[in-house]
Amino acid sequence: SSQEKKAKQNKKRGKFMSDYIVRAIAADSQIRAFAAVTTETVETARKDHNTSPVATAALGRLLTAGSMMGVMMKGDKDILTLQVKGDGLLQGITVTADSKGRVKGYVVEPDVIIPANAKGKLDVGGAVGHGFLQVIKDMGLKEPYVGQVALQTGEIAEDLTYYFAASEQVPSAVGLGVLMNKDNTV
């Protein structure tokens, strides 16, 4: 059918039909909420970079955050870069996103395998370690905006919550998760 053909073309172009972002605004734009499903994007990154489960979880969290933060930018040519650099085995993660929420990224050491944390979960914080989160917004001005904060936990979401409060003075709550299947797919 023509719909199946279009879906295949979109997939080739990197447009994932099942991934989406929902935005909500309340209280005269004083409150904003974003929710995203990025399963296909994260699974594609896992396959393309042959990432271990903990590397997939770390990259997936940052890809999702990048996509949501990308759509917060106004200009069509605006580019957002998120960089996590830590002393853990992953060493670093870099993600770039545009204002349409299209995102790509990589992990410096994609094949890291470490034991689960005390809760029996993938230990993203342990794999990232101590370091910093840098947010670069290139909005076509002479110089890009660069904000940097120390990593709070290395778990990505808490680090972004801290970034929004410290660098952008925006009280926020950020939650990010990547559910891995037993066969290591997303």
For the regions a language model picked out, list residue spans one by one:
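Interaction interfaces in information-processing and related assembly proteins
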Residues: 3-186
